[in-house]
Regions:
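Short glycine- and acidic-rich boundary segments immediately preceding or forming the N-terminal edge
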Residues: 62-63, 69, 74-111
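N-terminal Sec-pathway targeting helices
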Residues: 1-12
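Juxtamembrane proline-rich low-complexity "stalk" or linker regions positioned immediately after a signal peptide
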Residues: 25-84
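Alpha-helical scaffold elements lining the catalytic groove of polysaccharide deacetylases
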Residues: 145, 192-222, 237-283
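Hydrophobic alpha-helical membrane-insertion segments, chiefly the h-region
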Residues: 12-25
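Active-site beta->alpha N-cap acidic-glycine motif
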Residues: 91-201, 211-220, 227-228, 302, ...
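Active-site-proximal beta-strand/loop segments in catalytic clefts of secreted hydrolases
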Residues: 137-140, 163-167, 190-191, 232-236, ...
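C-terminal domain-boundary segment and adjacent tail
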Residues: 124-127, 170, 296-357
C-alpha cells in the first residue's frame, strides 16, 4: 500500500513539473505574443473600416433576455450588450410587478459609418421581428412629463431610448441623470430643435453642424458620462448633405417606423389609441413619442399595459461604442452660462419650497 502511495505522489510531482514547463514555454513564446499584437491591430483596423455595414454587422442581438422582467442580480445579459470599455446600463431593481411588460431582448447597434434606421425613411436595416417594439421619446427631458414616463417604464421593468434636446438637458441635468441611472439609452436631438432642412441651416452646413454638435455635447455633459451616438433629426427632416457628416462622426440616424403624432393629441387615451392602432396595422416597429408632451406621460401606464395584453415585446437598443464629443462644441455649450457644472444637481423641490401660503 505504501509503495502505491509513493508511486502516485511521484507521478503527481512529475505531472506538475511538466505542466509548469509548458506554461513557461508559452509565456516566453514570441510567436504567441506577436499573434496577440496582430489580433489587436486587426481589431483596430476593423473599427476604422467605414464601409457600409450589412444588417448582421450593424445590428447584433446581445445575450438574449427572457420576456419576463429583469431582476436586480441579472446583470450578465445587460453587460454583454456593451464592450468592456463602455459602461453597462444600470439594471432595474427587482421587479415586483407580476404583470410587467419586461424586455424581450437587447439589440447592440454598431454605429460605425452612421447607419440609418426607421422604415419611414430608411429601408436597409429592419431588425425588429413580428410583434417587437422599440420605444423612443423625443424633446425631453422635461419636468413633470419625463418623470411620469420613467416611472411607467420602471414599474413595467422595461426600457426605452430618449433623444434629448441639448438645451433642455442643460436646464434639467438631474432628469437626464435619472434616465441614465435607470439604464435608459440617451441620444441627442440637436441643441434647440431647429429644422435643419430650412434656412439658415440649409444654406450653411457649418451652422447645421453646430446645432447638431452642441446638442451632442450638452446631453453628454448633462448626463455626466457616456451617452449613445444615436441622433434623430427634428421633425424627421433629414438633409442629404448632413448624412455623410454624421457618418464621419459614427453617429447612427434614427427615423421611425411608427409616428404616434402624440404632439397633436391632448388626451392620454388618444395617445394610446394612436399607438395601438398603428402597431396593429404595422405589426411591429420603432415607436416615436415625446416625453415633452404631458398627455404622453399620462398615457404610458395604460399603453404599456395594452402592449403586454396585445402580445407585444419590447426591444431595447444600446450602442456598441459611446459617443465622443468635440472640444470646440463643449466650450460653446459652457459659454451659454446655462449649464450647471455641479456634479450633484439638486431637484427643484430641494432648492425651492413653499413654507407659507
Amino acid at each position: 500500500m505504501r509503495i502505491v502511495v509513493v508511486v502516485f505522489a511521484a507521478l503527481m510531482t512529475l505531472g506538475l513539473v511538466a505542466f509548469g514547463l509548458v506554461v513557461a514555454q508559452k509565456a516566453s513564446d514570441p510567436t504567441a505574443a506577436a499573434a496577440g499584437v496582430s489580433s489587436l491591430q486587426n481589431t483596430e483596423s476593423a473599427k476604422n473600416d467605414k464601409a457600409p455595414l450589412h444588417l448582421g454587422e450593424a445590428v447584433k442581438a446581445a445575450a438574449p433576455f427572457t420576456s419576463t422582467p429583469v431582476a436586480q442580480n441579472d446583470t450578465t445579459a445587460v453587460a454583454a450588450a456593451f464592450p468592456a470599455h463602455a459602461p453597462a446600463p444600470t439594471p432595474f431593481a427587482a421587479c415586483n410587478n407580476p404583470d410587467a411588460l419586461g424586455l424581450s431582448r437587447v439589440i447592440e447597434i454598431d454605429t460605425a459609418g452612421g447607419p440609418a434606421f426607421g422604415t419611414e425613411h430608411f429601408k436597409q436595416y429592419d431588425f425588429l421581428r413580428d410583434k417587437e417594439v422599440a420605444l423612443t421619446f423625443d424633446d425631453g427631458p422635461w419636468p413633470g412629463n419625463t418623470p411620469m414616463v420613467l416611472k411607467a417604464l420602471q414599474d413595467n421593468c422595461t426600457k426605452a431610448t430618449f433623444f434629448e434636446i441639448g438645451e433642455h438637458a442643460t436646464w434639467r441635468p438631474e432628469l437626464a441623470k435619472q434616465l441614465a441611472a435607470a439604464g435608459m439609452t440617451i441620444g441627442s436631438h440637436t441643441w434647440s430643435h431647429k429644422d435643419l432642412a430650412k434656412n439658415p441651416y440649409a444654406k450653411d452646413i457649418e451652422q447645421a453642424k453646430q446645432e447638431i454638435e452642441m446638442g451632442v455635447s450638452a446631453v453628454y455633459m448633462a448626463v455626466g458620462g457616456p451617452t449613445a451616438p444615436f441622433f434623430r433629426f427634428p421633425d424627421l427632416q433629414q438633409p442629404r448633405d448632413l448624412m455623410p457628416y454624421l457618418g464621419t462622426r459614427n453617429i447612427a440616424i434614427f427615423s421611425t417606423d411608427i409616428d404616434t403624432f402624440d404632439f397633436k393629441l391632448r388626451r392620454p387615451e388618444d395617445v394610446v389609441k394612436s399607438a395601438m392602432t398603428k402597431l396593429a396595422k404595422n405589426g411591429k416597429g420603432i415607436l416615436l413619442m415625446h416625453d415633452f408632451q404631458h398627455a404622453t406621460g399620462e398615457a404610458m401606464p395604460e399603453l404599456l399595459r395594452q402592449l403586454k395584453a396585445g402580445g407585444y415585446k419590447i426591444v431595447h437598443m444600446v450602442p456598441k461604442e459611446p459617443i465622443t464629443t468635440l472640444a470646440k462644441y463643449d466650450e460653446m455649450v459652457r459659454a451659454r452660462d446655462k449649464y450647471s457644472t455641479s456634479n450633484n444637481a439638486r431637484s427643484e423641490s430641494s432648492v425651492v419650497k413653499t413654507i407659507s401660503e
